[in-house]
Design a protein with these regions (language model features):
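Flexible, active-site-adjacent loop/turn segments at secondary-structure boundaries
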Residues: 8, 170-173, 177-178
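N-terminal charge/polar-biased segments
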Residues: 175-203
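Rossmann-fold NAD(P)-binding glycine/threonine-rich loop
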Residues: 1, 6-27
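Active-site-lining helix/loop region of Rossmann-like oxidoreductase modules
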Residues: 19-169, 173
Length: 203
């Protein structure tokens, strides 16, 4: 048996829960699933690209709209706290120096019933390039929300089965870093992918 925490409630990253899973000899992958090509992974990659190319990221936002029950539930603003933390930390973790709180806004924004299971994300990054010149990126991402996470969940299940076969317990750091927004240890996405490939090598 293993546990997958695909929602933004922090379990796999918490020492208390990690110890309990280790004591029981069970693997856990979490927390908060990162879609195959969703707003978080796109935002992370662009934020990292700014840094890698020597552009200072000054301000950024990510606004998300959807029509499914996930977005409907988040109309109750008290449910947004952990989701905003999860999505914001996922992006901030890719920066050498975190942006001030007032310069980053990331989170679910509203429920639009006629979108049904579609999700729209608007992402903007404002930066300063060589010679103190402004450099801005703005994009809109449209996805079918539910299936965008399905393949990721399947790959996470595969990693957990490998963990069971190898008798590895507790938080599976490589799988959590690659497949989840809020793992116990954040990695660059290319590093996390390589770590998953190494972990999955059963030879």
């Amino acid at each position: 048996m293993c546990f997958f925490n695909c929602i933004p409630v922090f379990i796999a990253k918490e020492q208390y829960w990690q110890k309990r899973f280790i004591d029981k000899g069970l693997p856990i992958v979490g927390d908060d699933i990162k879609s195959q090509v969703g707003a978080t992974i796109v935002h992370r990659v662009l934020a990292r690209l700014f840094e890698d190319r020597g552009v200072r990221l000054d301000k950024t936002y990510q606004l998300n709209f959807g029509g499914n029950t996930d977005f409907y539930n988040m109309l109750e603003r008290s449910r947004l706290k952990s989701k905003k933390i999860s999505k914001t930390d996922a992006v901030q973790s890719q920066l050498e120096k975190e942006l001030p709180t007032d310069d980053v806004h990331i989170g679910p924004s509203d429920h639009v019933p006629w979108l049904e299971d579609r999700k729209w994300a608007y992402i903007r990054l404002e930066g300063t390039s060589w010679g103190d010149q402004p450099l801005n990126v703005e994009l809109k991402l449209e996805v079918e929300d539910s299936p965008n996470s399905a393949g990721v969940a399947i790959d996470a299940i595969r990693c957990a089965k490998i963990a069971l076969d190898k008798k590895v317990s507790g938080s599976i750091e490589s799988a959590s870093a690659y497949f989840m927004k809020s793992p116990s240890i954040q990695m660059r996405d290319d590093d996390a992918r390589r770590a998953v490939e190494e972990f999955s090598d059963i030879n």
